[in-house]
Design a protein with these regions (language model features):
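Transmembrane alpha-helix segments characteristic
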Residues: 245, 442-467
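Short hydrophobic/aromatic helix or loop-helix immediately within or flanking a transmembrane segment
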Residues: 175-213
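Membrane-interface alpha helices of multi-pass inner-membrane proteins
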Residues: 293-311, 315
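Aromatic- and kink-enriched transmembrane "portal" helix at the membrane-lumen/periplasm boundary
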Residues: 208-216, 246-271, 301-302, 306, ...
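Hydrophobic, aromatic-rich transmembrane alpha-helices
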Residues: 225-231, 412-447, 492
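Transmembrane-helix motifs of polytopic, lipid-linked glycan transferases
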Residues: 214-243, 433-439
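Hydrophobic/aromatic-rich transmembrane helices and adjacent perimembrane loops
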Residues: 266-272, 471-498
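Membrane-lumen/periplasm interface segments of specific transmembrane helices
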Residues: 346-426
């Protein structure tokens, strides 16, 4: 016999349904971008980066190698595996070439890539669809193509020998070489690639004809779930208004939406550390939850670092941002020294465990990167870390102010409906509000501290890797959404609501 739910139980059910509803809305938007028809970058955003994951899945399913790394680019003679599979590669045709065959000499022209540079080399052979085999006597490269010269006195042609897509390369002993190759991406461990590769092999989720829907759904769902949990905790700590500002920004930001489903970036790993830090700040008086938070801090940074080091300074500062805000406010408001001591100790241990997670990931990566951990560390620092922080071109050295200035000039909407040219105004209005409130004796120090802490959190990567940030403006605007834009909107909306109520 059924019973009627109590008031408390009904409230719990409503909260659960509300939580699920918020997650579903974010997930669907991250999958299909139904909230912003002007976001033209959505469909192919960072598709080249995503091929590092799909490439390793293709390579593994074709048993090219038992790869220790989780990321790599998959190549055939036609070029790299790109975001849209199944498109037919067209070999060069112009006044000198016809479908890849030279009109005048015994030469062929291929896309220059890792596969052709590895196998279309002097000493190997090329076998055509007709079964005829020619030795390769030389290969020459330019910026885009690789030209192969064959041991033949007469030019070859497509009508006689068939399409170049049906050719095969043979080694010096006449053994057939693989039809594809994978170039391992060694700049990071690539945990995300290992996870998706496991799903493809063990769970029967191989990518079919480029359909990544299931994988995108997983990333979108995990990102949406992470954001809703973050919003839920913000509501507990700060109230409905700030929570709403975070949710709306996560829903409507073109940058957050574009990154959300990407298999390489796995955006949810960026914000789980912030979720951990916020949870710790809420339950800071509970020793049990503090201990769990330390372990979660270590684990979340470990996972993020194994998936890549991009934005790591902002992510780690984001983890401690709420704790730092609390500590500064405690010092200003002369809170009990015991509570300040607990907050400082919690901040220190959280940071220590986070740093330990980063170091663990770094050592794991170094083990695979070189012949031994020490050599691997040298490779990572000299070949990867310096390149990422200084930029691709080390000869370029721009000022920090110039880099920051570029990131105050939005090329997209801030959120749907708010044009990017208003960003400077949106950043400035809270400062004007704080000055006015300070003069009138109504200053809200919590809001001031939130504004300052999240501003520093967002710009930390611009400062640490300014040359890299200078080059990668096509993606780094997302760093403003690590709380800073949300706080700006919150301060403005909060004061506007007070003004409308006559309480300004």
């Amino acid at each position: 016999m059924s019973r009627t739910l109590s008031i408390k139980e009904r409230r719990t059910v409503k909260k659960i349904l509300f939580f699920i509803g918020l997650t579903i809305i974010l997930t669907i938007n991250y999958m299909y971008n139904f909230m912003d028809s002007q976001n033209n970058a959505f469909n192919d955003f960072q598709a080249d980066s995503e091929t590092l994951v799909t490439g390793i899945i293709f390579a593994d399913c074709r048993e090219l190698d038992n790869m220790q790394y989780g990321l790599g680019r998959y190549y055939t003679k036609s070029g790299p595996l790109m975001s849209r599979y199944g498109t037919n590669y067209t070999y060069l045709t112009d006044e000198n070439w016809t479908l890849g065959y030279s009109n005048y000499t015994a030469q062929l022209i291929f896309d220059k890539n890792y596969y052709t540079q590895t196998y279309a080399v002097e000493g190997n052979f090329i076998k055509f669809a007709t079964g005829e085999i020619f030795p390769i006597i030389s290969s020459m490269e330019d910026d885009e193509y690789l030209v192969v010269s064959l041991a033949s006195d007469e030019p070859l042609n497509v009508s006689q020998y068939g399409s170049l897509s049906e050719t095969a390369f043979l080694d010096q002993e006449g053994r057939k070489l693989p039809d594809s190759a994978v170039e391992i991406y060694k700049s990071q461990y690539g945990l995300q690639g290992k996870v998706f590769r496991f799903m493809a092999n063990s769970l029967g989720m191989e990518i079919q004809e480029g359909d990544k829907t299931v994988y995108h759904l997983i990333c979108s769902l995990l990102t949406g779930l992470t954001f809703v949990m973050l919003v839920w905790l913000i509501r507990i700590k700060y109230g409905n208004l700030l929570a709403s500002c975070f949710y709306i920004t996560f829903l409507l930001s073109p940058w957050v939406v574009n990154f959300a489903k990407n298999l390489y970036w796995v955006e949810f790993t960026w914000f789980i550390p912030m979720l951990v830090g916020l949870f710790c700040s809420i339950y800071i008086d509970n020793k049990k939850w503090r201990a769990i938070s330390y372990i979660a801090a270590y684990t979340s940074i470990l996972i993020k670092s194994l998936c890549g080091y991009e934005y790591i300074s902002t992510i780690m500062l984001g983890m401690t941002s709420f704790l730092v805000t609390d500590i500064i406010y405690m010092l200003i408001s002369h809170t009990d020294k015991r509570k300040i001591g607990i907050a400082f100790r919690t901040f220190f241990l959280t940071s220590l465990f986070a740093l330990a997670g980063f170091i663990t990931a770094f050592i794991i990566h170094a083990y695979y990167r070189g012949e031994g951990i020490w050599q691997g560390i040298q490779y990572i620092i000299l070949e990867d870390a310096i390149r990422r922080t200084r930029g691709i071109d080390n000869t370029v050295d721009v000022s920090l102010w110039y880099v920051l200035g570029r990131y105050f000039q939005f090329q997209t909407e801030i959120i749907t409906g708010i044009p990017g040219n208003l960003f400077v105004i949106i950043c400035t209005i809270p400062i004007c509000i704080f000055i006015y409130e300070y003069v009138t004796g109504k200053i809200n120090w919590k809001d001031v501290i939130l504004y300052g802490v999240f501003f520093l959190t967002s710009i930390s990567w611009f400062c640490l890797a300014k040359n890299h940030a200078y080059v990668h403006t096509h993606m780094n605007y997302v760093l403003w959404y690590f709380g800073y834009i949300q706080i700006c909107i919150y301060v403005i909306v909060k004061r506007f609501a007070k003004f409308c109520k006559g309480k300004a």
